[in-house]
Regions:
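Short, surface-exposed ligand- or partner-binding patches at beta-edge/loop junctions that are enriched
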Residues: 79
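Rhodanese-like catalytic fold shared by cysteine-dependent sulfurtransferases
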Residues: 2-32, 40-75, 84-120
Length: 120
């Protein structure tokens, strides 16, 4: 990784919120697990290249599925449409001991910044 998590956590959360360019750089690392926490329908409309999983944070089973699916020994990079749902997902995973980075502006910010998206 290009940076250390030591001392990077904010007062109100124990995960790192990053901008589009930081997120793009972070997910270049193949050790990072990239998760889209939007609905399957939203994911099907387009997603960030390299996304490993689509686990809908609005589902009651999110925590169970995420903790059973995501390796705890690898950092997790989360995004949603605008950054709200992914913050919820990030709090859940960080509280479970995961190292989490969250795309503050979500997929909308990614697209608005001119980054590549996978579309059907």
């Amino acid at each position: 990784m290009g940076f250390s998590f030591f001392g990077l956590f904010g007062q109100n959360h124990n995960f790192k919120i990053v901008d589009v360019n930081e997120f793009a750089e972070y997910i270049k690392d193949t050790a990072v697990t990239v998760v889209d926490v939007r609905t399957p329908a939203e994911h099907a409309e387009g997603h960030i290249p390299g996304t490993d999983f689509n686990i809908d944070v609005l589902e009651d089973t999110y925590t169970k599925i995420a903790t059973e699916t995501l390796p705890k020994d690898k950092p997790v990079a989360l995004y949603c449409r605008s950054g709200n749902r992914s913050k919820t997902a990030a709090r859940i995973l960080a509280d479970k001991g995961y190292e989490v980075v969250e795309l503050g502006t979500g997929f909308r910010g990614w697209v608005a910044a001119g980054k590549k998206a996978v579309k059907p």
